């Protein structure tokens, strides 16, 4: 009996320590300091500090606030993000020359696309964590938000290039459907093209 009880206690302690390590490890790798310990992540971090998201209402968001789902109910998404998405980035950090911002910029469109697709997959969960009960200002914004809801769009479909250096925007619904990056067509250009095709 005492052998079984001892095994049970040891198993319980090991289990609790394991859970603590998983939660503690996740918390550690979600810190901005951890993210920017890779040389290439310094560039986006400096851009964040110059963006409208930095300092607004006293908030200084970290990398995780946009790029890692937070909270207990999203813990599995945070783990997935660090393991499945983060490990390839870590490997790329060692196999790609990011020694200058110009070299980093060569890879920026690919990184932006992947980040946008993650936000799309999460229904802009990380945006909504801070921007709750958004009230669109003005008639055009209200119309755009109504259209967003009816067409299955989410925050990131329209709100791209808000924080980091601008790169070409993507049509995320088309990208999902085609399984590859699809550039967003400017509305005016699209309308002009349609007019030209009627002639």
Regions found by a protein language model. Give the residues of each.
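Short sequence/structural segments immediately N-terminal
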Residues: 1-199
